[in-house]
UniProtKB/Swiss-Prot annotation:
Belongs to the UPF0246 family. InterPro entries: YaaA (IPR005583). This is UPF0246 protein ECA3888. One of its GO terms (cellular component) is cytosol. It comes from the Bacteria. HAMAP family: UPF0246. PANTHER family: PEROXIDE STRESS RESISTANCE PROTEIN YAAA, PEROXIDE STRESS RESPONSE PROTEIN YAAA. It comes from Pectobacterium atrosepticum (strain SCRI 1043 / ATCC BAA-672) (Erwinia carotovora subsp. atroseptica). One of its GO terms (biological process) is response to hydroperoxide.
Amino acid sequence: MLITISPAKTLDYTSPLATTRYTQPELLDYSSQLISVCKKLTPAHIASLMSISDKLADLNAGRFSEWHPDFTPENARQALLAFKGDVYTGLAAESFSEDDFDFAQQHLRMLSGLYGVLRPLDLMQPYRLEMGTKLENKAGKDLYSFWGDTITEKLNQALHAQGDDVLINLASDEYFKAVKPKNLNARLIKPVFLDEKNGKFKVISFYAKKARGLMSRFIIQNRLTQPEQLKAFNLEGYAFEAADSSANELVFKRHEQ
């Protein structure tokens, strides 16, 4: 099984590292092309394009100008340990063993607006470039046109390397839109996490993001290789709901506490 997750806007480049091992991202030539476009943007343009504050725009203009493709542990950090959003709170990779990192490196992929596809130990310099950003480039008007089939091909290579044909989609819609399911050599399975609020079950973004991380951790730490095994997921009060699930959509519900 291959798992896809989204990146995070919040980054951590200071806390202690859970592993010193690292790999290099495989699509840096593409990243360099995007950086050359981004380096031409003024902070004001960045603020408008990304709908962020002037302070954040200045920070990211600086990141773009300082970015260069010679990645070392001194100027970059392993992607799985650099991202720090809700998904990564659930994943809690800072407590992974070396064996956990080995399994994750083979079975987990992070989709990224700048890096395309990242493996957990791939070094990453700090950036902000969400997949939905309407950044004009030589391929078209946005990042979906820029990445084209590249991300899908990379996922196919990872599936082929492990001799498998199941992809567990734990990424957001914004990011998974960069994948072309018709060209993917895999059966797609999407876990959905519903929380009860006022007697009704619905997707609550904050909880759902954390649950995607928890599910990723559950797969990695239990070395799961079959979709059927996902139904045993029971972390933090979630339970599989067979009646609401289908072959390609696994629904997990959590009752109000």
